[in-house]
Amino acid sequence: MKSYVFSLKDLDKTQLAVAGGKGANLGELSKIEGIQVPEGFCITTDAYVRAVESSDEFNVLVGEMSTLSAGELAKVNEMSGKIRGLIESLPIPAEIEEEITAFLEKFGEQNAYAVRSSATEEDLPTASFAGQQDTYLNIIGRDEILKHVSKCWASLFTDRAVIYRMQNQFDHRKVSLSVVIQKMVFPQASGILFTADPITMNRKITSIDASFGLGEALVSGLVNADNYKVRDGRIMDKKVSPKKLAIYALKEGGTQEKKVAAENQNRQALTDQQILELEKTGRRIEAHFGRPQDIEWCLYDHQFFIVQSRPITTLYPVPDKKDGKNHVYMSFSHQQMMTDAMKPLGLSFFQLGFQDKPEKKSEGDLFLPIGGRLYFDLAHDLSSSMGRKIVLASMGKIDPLVLNMLKSLAKRKDFLKSLSRSGKGFFSMGTGYFSWGLVVQSIKISRDNDASIVPTLMSQNEASVRELQHRMESLSGEELFAAVIRELKRMKEAVCDPKSMGAVYAGTLASSWINKNMEKWLGEKNAAGSLSKSAANNVTSEMGLELLDVADVVRQSPAVMEYLGHAKDQTFFEDLEGLEGGDAVSKSIQAYLEKYGMRCPGEIDITRPRFSEQPTALVPSILSNIKNFEPGAHNTRAEQGQLETKRKEQDLLNRLEQLPGGKQKAKKVREKISVLRNFIGYREYPKYLMVRYYWIIKQALLREADKLVQKGVIREKEDIYYLSFEELREAVRANRVDYGIITERKAEYEAYAKLTPPRVMTSEGEALSGEYDTGNIPKGALAGIPASSGTVEGRARVVLKIEDAHMEDGDILVTTFTDPSWTPVFVSIKSLVAEVGGMMTHGSVIAREYGLPAVVGVENATKLIKDGQRIRVNGTEAYVEILSQE
């Protein structure tokens, strides 16, 4: 005979499908020596299925629910209410009722019990569904307990549970629910313990929230809780809150709010000794589960009882370093304006391209993959006084928030003493990744100011790309993978060539010099931005302007314009050929893709779909260009930019000449402007070169993926994205792969994609915080980094994906980050606000090139600014004001 009810002691963490997350975890907790768990039993998920499976009405309603989306709140509310009502009205099958009754007799039918929901998708390692279903406390009597079992089953369809499943792509028909019934504990105090600080994410700090009575008062937000921080067995901080209310159990069943006696309201809920004892309990539980835990506890008769433990799913991962030293990890992804999670092949491929000896099969350690993003370790740089000075000076020009974080860290003497000194520094001149040769080249190039250097460098690299294309076309198997290693070495040499990087730095140093001295002499901030418009040899700004030419071809064909509104990538060019004017449009777009088709959002990740793979991503920008610009706008905008730059240059020179020593100042500024104009555009080229290498190699790897699909090694060619480069190499060699790894990596990637990567974190897991200096900005304004000067007002368009960027003339783009692929969108907008970026990141450079006021590094901009609101962007003083709430 099938059993529907089990004692908690008979369950463990492997029985998620039977007992749900809460039941499985409680069963596992009961097996840890020294951990007290209230006695109880679990009604399995099979019991829920048995109770609802015979109801045709239930199946119909759940089917209808599955057709709704999370945004249809009224319909979700109505449908979920019907399902709950139906479940509560269904009789509990007799065999299940008998088993429940038997367990109640065993534990004492007249005892008070807590009746808790335990869903199968609850408290997973990668997602926490805490609070999505219901809990009922102090339930007494068999009939009441049975009634509340049905209520728990019904709570699988609360509005919040349904919407959460919709948002996280869980199927309503594939989730089920068990019910945990435990003897009530009537606590003097209760609360929540986090074995890692939920605010800073520091794994060394335990954070305890505590209040009087039952924990439901705390969880529901009814009362303020005490908070205690413990590190290494020492209480490091205590915040004792006034606790005016508490929830207590009633003898006859149910609960009641009570006022706390005045003399006890400001008393610690736990003594210091109890705090330290509870911290040890938390660490024991964490050690058992092998990861940080969110633990619900209660104190009764001087003894701690644990009523739940679940993984903390919001913590950002930390590298597992075994050296016993401190490390400091700075996000490279933020500097690249690409904070989305990357897939394993993308991470390992990028690492491989920038390690010292890519011919070795070990993948590089300059860039560390953490939580699906790229970080580099600053420990070596920060371990010395000189190194800290170099890092802080460098970050002052890149990201003020990171600068403030590192300044704060530099004050922690004990932390600095234990920093790792192994490996290379990232910023350390001569010993790290910045060479004296680069300094010499940039000085020489600035002094000579030879405008022919950049076209010569570009011509040489174009030839190398053509040769690469030819070499890769005929390669396959191990021969291909060996060639990829060689080509990545060539790519690194080309991208990091001292002469090439010297040209980049010549432009950026000229920009810094102009900004510094124009503010000093004329009180004008960020003047270089106004002098960078229509600069020569800027492949990224040209990418945006050349899409205007494509729009001019498209606008001549109404049939094509209509088709673009519903175009599909798979048949894009085939469909165009069948339309009037489609042949000309097809040739125009294909010519554009020949130059720029290797670009895409997040292009440093080789796995991301390129414009050549997903041409419809360009459609919104093409249609916006047709709507917002007259024919021939490319040349008009380029000429206008050059004219505005000339006017700005002359204005500055005229004003300088009025100053003491003005003629000499004006002469020097004229020279620096010439250097700026000759070299600032080239700053975009090295990355363009890199992604061209990426695209050629990606096409070769996808040819290998097609072969693996044909042989049945993988199911779809995109599966290779979830293998590292070396794993893919081995799969091709052996014609074999453990598909379980791919499945596991896909789940891991989805979990990483939901995390917010910190700009800077320590090896203890602490996410450092930093703030802008907001002293000179209007009250309530959002602070950021000045990326491009000027002040404008307009309608905010909050856009998270380039394919959703349907912009109108005068709109202000508000987004998380922009990389070069977003440049076509910049043509139509009035201004830019981005959550991520710095003065010299791509979005900032192109904003200056196009003359768009821009503020970047505005934290949570896409959440604080609503789509359609009218906002003011001050790119000079680096703030954004929300002017209307509509």
Q: Which residues does each PLM region occupy?
A:
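Short, compositionally biased low-complexity segments
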Residues: 52-80, 119-129, 235-260, 641-651, ...
